[in-house]
Amino acid sequence: MVPFSGLTAVQMAFMADRVMYYIEELCRRCGAAVDFEYWRKITKRVLEGLADRKPLVCPARAGSGKSTWITAFLLAACELRLNNDPLADVFSVLLVLQKIESLNGIRDTIADFFTNAPETLVVPLQGWTAASQKAGFCKNKQVTSFDQCRKDNCPYAASCDVLRFGQLAGQAFVLGVSQARFDLLRKGNALDGLLQQVENAHPRILIFDEKFEFAPIYRLTQTTLDAASSQLERLITQRDLKDRRVFEKQRWTTTLLRRPFSLLREHTCIELDETTKAKADIPYGRCSLVDADNAEKERFGQFRDYLNGPGRAFRTPALSEAVEVIDRLYRGECLFTKLGAFTILGADEPQISFGDSLTLVFDATAQVDGDYQYLDAEMLPASKPRHMEKLCLHVYTSADMNVSRLAMRKSWKLPGFCALMEDILRRYEGKMFLTTYKDLAAEIPKLLDPQALSRLLLDGETCPYFGGTNGSNEFNTASLVMLLGYPRLSPQTYLERTFVYWGHSGIRQQIWDQTAQWSPLNVQKRPDLHAQLPLTMDYEVRHLAARLEQEIYRCQLRNAVCDEAVHVFLFAPPQALDARLGKRFRGAMSVHENLTPGCIVQAQANAKTYAGQSTVYARFAAWLSSWDRAPTPLDNILRDAEIGTESWKKLRKSGRFAPLLAQYGAEMTGRGRNVKIEEKSQKCA
């Protein structure tokens, strides 16, 4: 076979024109608008990549037309294939999407354009899912879960599209898989069969609509080992195995996996006192089984080879993970951490290329995301940010505005921020997208007044929460965005990911150096990773910037047309994070609020107690909050709020009294026994 040297200029121009044609047609059908010149440039570079095979990362912003381009590129490619154009012989496509529903949707779209296409044109490879049954691929309505699928033994097997897709996968011109399936096949070393179409000498183009895990990470914990045993136990009923055979494998895991794990758990400690033999955990460092007995290594090797060969049916997900880590420990050093539960980390080097395939990854935040920092890939141009003239970032810098998980546990925080939310909704028009921590998402709607609640975009009956809105376009009517929290990972996770993804930065040597410095004097202190390993802080800032940008772009900014001003509210972000976000939204207005809002100050005061009782300020504020606006004699107020005369006098003299009255639009009138609280004719803003 003559080596492929790339498309000619004429061929690339022709293909690019067909992609542009389909982009225009798709935009016409759904009323969308995209930057055609930008996508023409991206198309040209992708086609050039068929020759050099250098992996490409496209940082097209959210809402810029990524999904439209992917569909248009596939339509143009399928048109070539159906017309028997020689261009279609130099590539095929492996499409990796997050959701099965999206795969099925693209298949339907292509079928609408090419009604009589062969079944091998587009194949969405999938197991049983609710989506596959909804699409009519599974004909057995009695099956309601993946575990119930009997595959070839099902009475509907002959007409099952799910099984048929598996049979057609190798022949498919466009083969679609979910990201979860791709990761599973990759970890199981079973990916090679998908990288090339049968009877096509050239490898597939791999298109990912979102970032995937470039470095498969394996974690060995006590939970992993327990899960391995439980999953083996379930095989007895799932695969009708004899208990004796499963018990034999569980016994092997005790000897070959649990025992070395427990040994390392014990050895990753420092003795504090020779007399009492008291010990303390080493927070993090390196461990290994290289010096283990050769007989143990050999027994483990036999077990590993058995699971990879004749015993593959017993290789459950948790057992596979445990075996991967132990195998690495016998071959060299691994990172361990005790910042949480004892964890041993096994990971491959980050990889974005597979075989000779051209890889194209779409990721709107790739330019800021730390996972790309040391990745060997070409970063394509970003699309121009849209609607920046409409955007205003409101950044509250006061320490009282801290919205970390720990800070939000304070009793006054949630009521205070709900009051601030109501104030924002009074000042600005439009719907609000608020995202927060999962445990707060259900509480916020309960604390808002009905008018404010009616303008809050909910996910069911709760607010959206971090990690629960991935890929969602459901909030693109919002013109107000409130980020009540930060989607931080655990310190242990940041340490692990920096270790894996920033290996070329020197982080691994820093960790090894720190390992040698642990002593009885410092090992008992809570480790300050940001001080000991500054690179972990840099990685964390990049991660947060990428995640927050994703959340901000769920509003009207992602739309082709943005008629309203967009206001985004951030609370006490770290300075480095604030700076990175500012660079990502160049052209937007930025307002830094240095003072603590009055409603937050009041919420703090309301929560204060003295000798177990509410303070005078809190009691008077509570009375004002339920006041019916009718003129009320002071004597009645003091009686109802249980405030003594002397306490009232002290409150009157305090600097907080006048602002509290102003907040509720109240004033004091009269003298002596005729003093009243009345509503002002004009309230303060």
Describe the function of each predicted region:
Residues 1-685:
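ASCE RecA-like P-loop NTPase motor cores
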